[in-house]
Amino acid sequence: GDAAKGANVAKSCGTCHSFEQGGAKKQGPNLFGITTRGPGKAEGFNYSPSYKAAAAKGFAWDAATLQDYITDPTAFLSNKTGDAAARDKMTFKLAKPDERADVIAYLATLK
């Protein structure tokens, strides 16, 4: 993916997420450092019970995992938890594969 293009695509995510170090939590957690911290570790953010259950089972925010999550957060959590009723606060899906790859490349620069 192209991080510069991803930064542009990620602007649409800015309604719910901040991207700068120390940025405020919004409807969603701050995404700065997402690829270097564990899931559910954004300070001060109250994750959904399903997200917490998935995080407790263990996974890392690598490119493949981010790809699965931003494709369909609900399906991702259902698969991780084994609970078909699992739900997340994030309902937005990034439909275009090239945009997902670009956003993931951008997120990887936020360290």
Curated annotation (Swiss-Prot):
It holds the Pfam family Cytochrom_C. It comes from the Bacteria. The keyword Electron transport applies. GO terms for molecular function: electron transfer activity; heme binding; metal ion binding. Binds 1 heme c group covalently per subunit. The keyword Mitochondrion does not apply. Keywords: Electron transport, Heme, Iron, Metal-binding, Transport. Heme c binds at C13, C16, H17, M90. Coiled coil: none annotated. This is Cytochrome c-550.
